[in-house]
Design a protein with these regions (language model features):
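Small-aliphatic-rich amphipathic alpha-helix that forms the alpha element of a beta-alpha
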Residues: 53-79
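Surface-exposed amphipathic alpha-helices with a cationic face
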Residues: 38-46, 96, 100, 129
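Glycine-rich phosphate-binding active-site loops on the catalytic face of alpha/beta enzymes
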Residues: 22-24, 71-88
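Alpha/beta enzyme core
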Residues: 1-50, 66-73
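Structured core elements
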Residues: 19-21, 51-53, 75-79, 181, ...
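Histidine/acidic-residue-rich catalytic or RNA/ligand-binding cores of hydrolases
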Residues: 34, 88-94
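A mid-to-C-terminal "edge-of-domain" accessory segment
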Residues: 97-99, 103-213
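Short, ordered loop/turn segments at secondary-structure junctions
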Residues: 24-27, 55-57, 80-82, 207
């Protein structure tokens, strides 16, 4: 009942509520719906007093939070590594660097986080998993061990020439590192990169590389 919900929201705000938090409790709302809902709510409560609490049941908690911000919301709730009931909550390890490093947000909003602290995000993510004795999700955006891993030979060659071809940010900005994987999909670039990472200097035309491939 949208009309009743809006009347409750307005009553709370009119009686002095500092924040009105919109909760996607069952996690089923989609980004375009969040945009529509926030658009209606901001007609009765200023965006500066609105927050969003998103669950990840459709895999859209981060996207819903970003949609809410672009529509006027100014408080975003989330958790480290997206931990939370059922499928989890909006992942702060994705939201924080997106707000800080992506111009669509950093150029419009005061984030209140120093760049030196952004570099602690990967350590923060992994520390929580260690405390919880929980296996880290290697595929987490920004902070996962695989977030900047490259396996295919063409990928590795391209990244070495221009990292932006396969990396949307410099991994060091969030305290992560690039990882070149050697596998049956590897090319010459993978082998050379891995050898150099362990301080073994080798020429590209060294016949030993062909044997390894």
């Amino acid at each position: 009942n949208p009309k009743y919900a809006l009347s409750c929201i307005k009553a709370a705000y009119d009686q002095g509520a500092r924040w009105v938090i919109l909760c996607d409790t069952n996690g089923g709302t989609l980004p375009h719906e969040v945009t529509q809902i926030v658009g209606e709510v901001t007609k009765v409560v200023p965006g500066k007093n609105l927050g969003i609490h998103a669950h990840n049941d459709t895999g859209n908690a981060v996207a819903n939070s970003l949609a809410a911000v672009l529509s006027g919301v100014r408080q975003i709730q989330g958790t480290i590594n997206g931990l939370g009931e059922r499928c989890g909550n909006a992942n702060l390890m994705s939201l924080i660097p997106t707000f800080f490093l992506k111009k669509d947000f950093s150029s419009k909003f005061e984030i209140g986080i120093k760049s030196k602290n952004i570099k602690n995000l990967t350590d923060c993510s992994r520390l929580l998993d260690e405390i919880l004795n929980r296996k880290p999700n290697q595929h987490l955006p920004y902070v996962g061990a695989a977030a900047f891993s490259h396996k295919g030979g063409l990928h590795v060659s391209a990244v070495q020439k221009d990292p932006k071809t396969y990396e949307h940010i410099n991994p060091e900005e969030v305290g992560n590192t690039r990882n070149i994987v050697v596998s049956d999909q590897s090319g010459k670039s993978n082998i050379i990169s891995r050898l150099k990472s362990i301080k073994i200097d080798i020429q590209e035309n060294d016949p030993k590389i062909k044997k390894l491939l």
